[in-house]
């Protein structure tokens, strides 16, 4: 099964919502490269309409307010499968961050209410269960999350990593992973994104690639096994998927 097919099989559909800002690139102070969960790099960036320009922008609303958000095009953001897809596309390690360093992001503002100011939070175990506020040193401009002049524009968004920060999560075979979640306060949103980042020095680039390949292969085997046993992942509820993950049935 291809990586794209695997992603399609493991992400649930969700009610469609519009999003107006997307983190299209993220780089750590020590290198690496990534982007926000759910971002599709083929999405055109020269318009403001819902289709196709808002399809991969994340919104945190309702049941998704305290999670990883959702997009119009992909539904609920899934950390594991989407991180695999991001690494496969960039061919790079995740953004490499240092305690006391920074995560440097590019925020594409789609339309007027994708504007700043943005706030950022960090989750140290990649579960998304608990978030701590971190300092934003550079934010897209705006007042009350509105700025019509900023539509269709890329802006820098920089968040500081706290001193002595530890990261303990494992995602897509990558160890020592933290999640950084940034959003504005738009009434129709909030809009923003979630970026997976890794403590610098955790894995060599070669080890990171091997771990990613092993993780993808393991997921393919698990999906194949579930199909043989009569499971259709796309038909399962989020609670059922979470239970399968806890039982080690899926990655």
From Swiss-Prot:
<dbReference type="GO" id="GO:0005737">
    <property type="term" value="C:cytoplasm"/>
</dbReference>
<dbReference type="InterPro" id="IPR021476">
    <property type="entry name" value="Egh16-like"/>
</dbReference>
<feature type="compositionally biased region" description="Polar residues">
    <location>
        <begin position="54"/>
        <end position="66"/>
    </location>
</feature>
<keyword id="KW-0843">Virulence</keyword>
<dbReference type="Pfam" id="PF11327">
    <property type="entry name" value="Egh16-like"/>
</dbReference>
<keyword id="KW-0963">Cytoplasm</keyword>
<comment type="function">
    <text>Appressoria-specific virulence factor required for appressorial penetration in host and lesion development.</text>
</comment>
<feature type="signal peptide">
    <location>
        <begin position="1"/>
        <end position="21"/>
    </location>
</feature>
<keyword id="KW-0732">Signal</keyword>
<protein>
    <recommendedName>
        <fullName>Appressoria-specific virulence factor GAS1</fullName>
    </recommendedName>
</protein>
<feature type="region of interest" description="Disordered">
    <location>
        <begin position="40"/>
        <end position="76"/>
    </location>
</feature>
